[in-house]
């Protein structure tokens, strides 16, 4: 099997996205990503709650922007971030390829991806994609969503021309007519849906979305478990606040992503579920169903065992005593 590069760089926004969360100089730094597809991370960054969780330690907090699961996995692979946000299947792909990550926390259950086109293309179903150009970001949930949709229609990646672009660039390519369809990701997908006439989500399947996984480097969990707990505790505070304050959370998403309040509310109030933060049987079952895709599409190394890596990836115990005990969740 030919090995394919499974973590692709973007080179975009990295330098400008590193923001110090607190000002110590003698201690360690914990680097955590934030992402427009992870609203709770935006809440923590806006409120300063992660820095607050480390305020009485000698540990600095640094934020780095992830534009997609592929970039988040790059941070993990290079040891550039101790904590990073990906889709579930992207986390399994990375773990299967030897990236030392564990998922003790699920930051969302979203319907964040669908297949998008414009009415004038004449595309009405997945079968109509045969021979067409489709934008997608390899190694992310929209890419795996596309593969599952093609499989359902009796097609494969070989039957379409996949144009590998980061999510915002895929949106722009569709608007500009450079591709016929796009495996979209919110909030960019919702922006297209609400603010561009003729945009259509022509294929939706919530079950093909693979959750939002918060991945911790194994070394961070082993060597600094108290710091890892502080991160989870901050996430619990942010999750509970976001559930109680959906309009305000959408406002933070709108501000950070530079999109309208209407787009942000579509994403957060209609397509994002924060109710189940612990990995469990549902996540394990979904990854088991999708593991063969990683091998079939050549997205893991020849000696990788995606199905066997699921147990190595998911940790249902680490955060179990934290969830529900994070405090008030408020200001």
Q: Predicted segment positions?
A:
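Conserved C-terminal helix/tail region of periplasmic/extracytoplasmic solute-binding proteins
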Residues: 294-331
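Sec/Tat-exported extracytoplasmic proteins
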Residues: 54, 80, 85, 95, ...
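Pocket-lining segment of extracytoplasmic ligand-binding domains
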Residues: 89, 162, 166-255
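Secondary-structure end/capping motifs
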Residues: 39, 224-301
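Short, glycine-/small- and polar/acidic-enriched structural segments
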Residues: 28-155, 162-164, 180-183, 201
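Solvent-exposed, polar/charged alpha-helical surfaces in well-ordered, non-transmembrane soluble domains
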Residues: 48, 52, 74, 78, ...
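N-terminal secretory signal peptides and thylakoid transit peptides that target proteins
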Residues: 1-18
């Amino acid at each position: 099997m030919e090995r394919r590069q499974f973590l692709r760089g973007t080179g975009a926004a990295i330098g400008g996205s590193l923001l110090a969360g607190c000002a110590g100089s003698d201690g360690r730094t914990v680097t955590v990503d934030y992402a427009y597809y992870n609203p709770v991370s935006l809440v923590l960054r806006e409120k300063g709650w992660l820095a607050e969780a480390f305020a009485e330690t000698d540990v600095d907090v640094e934020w780095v922007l992830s534009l997609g699961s592929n970039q988040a996995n790059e941070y993990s692979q290079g040891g550039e971030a101790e904590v990073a946000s990906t889709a579930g299947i992207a986390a399994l792909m990375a773990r299967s390829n030897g990236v030392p990550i564990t998922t003790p926390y699920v930051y969302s259950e979203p319907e964040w991806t669908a297949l998008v086109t414009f009415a004038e293309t004449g595309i009405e179903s997945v079968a109509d994609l045969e021979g067409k150009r489709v934008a997608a970001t390899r190694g992310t949930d929209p890419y795996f969503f596309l593969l599952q949709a093609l499989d359902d229609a009796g097609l494969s990646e070989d039957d379409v021309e996949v144009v590998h672009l980061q999510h915002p660039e895929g949106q722009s390519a569709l608007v500009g007519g450079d591709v016929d369809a796009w495996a979209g990701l919110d909030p960019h997908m919702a922006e297209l849906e609400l603010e561009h006439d003729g945009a259509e989500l022509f294929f939706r399947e919530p079950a093909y979305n693979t959750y939002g996984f918060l991945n911790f480097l194994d070394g961070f969990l082993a060597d600094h478990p108290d710091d890892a707990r502080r991160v989870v505790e901050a996430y619990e505070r942010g999750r509970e606040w976001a559930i109680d304050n959906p309009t305000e959370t959408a406002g933070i998403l709108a501000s950070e992503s530079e999109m309208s309040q209407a787009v942000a509310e579509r994403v957060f109030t209609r397509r994002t579920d924060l109710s189940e933060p612990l990995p469990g049987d549902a996540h394990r079952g979904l990854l088991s169903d999708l593991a063969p895709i990683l091998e079939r599409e050549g997205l893991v190394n020849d000696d990788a065992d995606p199905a066997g890596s699921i147990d190595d990836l998911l940790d249902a115990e680490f955060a179990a005593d934290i969830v529900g005990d994070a405090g008030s969740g408020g200001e």
